[in-house]
């Protein structure tokens, strides 16, 4: 039996309804805005991957450097766990962590999450081929949908990884709420040593 590829966390009617509400709310404000999730359809995700390779875009290089230096230590500290990556995109940087987990040989589950089904599906297929001993299943949905789903699932040990510059897409209060929701996801595990890598 082939492994599951994606779990879709929204039904299309509700997603369209919420999308319309988001657009109306954002464009009705004095300071017009749209939620960043609209940037990341298949084409937007592809463009962002290209932006990450530009010399001017330093966050990707900085995070890669940090992971190159500390991935083995992170894998040792977190051990056998469920690693959830919020906004995973192509999971390029995270492969450094996956390689480190592979070295220690513990049982391991990786759950990449994204709002772009195209890039998530491509990434999950590639990762399932490269890491056949890992359980890898993508979650398709927004951060809020992903975190709400994770709150309903109890697991032995969970590490949540939030890489990239997406924190800048939140208003301060929204980011506080986001971190609170991440904390709630970590409380729904049976291991007191859960981690959040931001």
Give a label for each model feature.
Residues 2-37:
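N-terminal auxiliary segments of SAM/dcSAM-dependent transferases
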Residues 35-36, 48-73:
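Class I SAM-dependent methyltransferase Rossmann-like catalytic core
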Residues 82-89:
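Conserved class I S-adenosyl-L-methionine
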Residues 90-104:
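Conserved SAM-binding loop of SAM-dependent methyltransferases across substrates and taxa
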Residues 106-143:
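Class I SAM-dependent methyltransferase SAM/SAH-binding core
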Residues 158-173:
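A short SAM/SAH-binding and catalytic strip from SAM-dependent methyltransferases
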Residues 176-187:
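A short glycine-rich, Lys/Arg-flanked "PGG" loop and its adjoining helix->strand segment in the class I
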Residues 188-198:
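Single conserved hydrophobic/aromatic residue that forms the stacking wall/gate
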């Amino acid at each position: 039996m082939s492994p599951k590829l994606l779990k879709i966390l929204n039904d299309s009617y509700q997603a369209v309804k919420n999308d319309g509400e988001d657009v109306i709310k954002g464009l009705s404000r004095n300071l017009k805005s749209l939620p960043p999730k609209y940037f990341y359809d298949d084409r937007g995700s592809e463009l962002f991957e290209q932006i990450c390779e530009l010399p001017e875009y330093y966050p990707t290089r900085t995070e890669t450097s940090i992971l190159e230096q500390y991935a083995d230590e992170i894998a040792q500290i977190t051990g056998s766990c469920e690693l959830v990556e919020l906004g995973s995109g192509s999971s390029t940087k995270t492969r450094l962590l996956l390689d480190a987990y592979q070295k220690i040989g513990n049982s391991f589950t990786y759950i990449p999450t994204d709002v772009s089904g195209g890039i998530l599906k491509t990434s999950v297929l590639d990762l399932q081929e490269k890491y056949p001993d890992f359980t890898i299943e993508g979650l398709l949905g927004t951060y809020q949908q992903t975190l709400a789903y994770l709150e309903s699932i109890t697991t032995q040990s969970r590490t949540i990884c939030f890489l990239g510059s997406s924190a800048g897409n939140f208003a301060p209060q929204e980011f506080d709420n986001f971190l609170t929701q991440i904390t709630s996801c970590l409380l729904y595990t049976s291991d007191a040593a859960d981690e959040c890598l931001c």
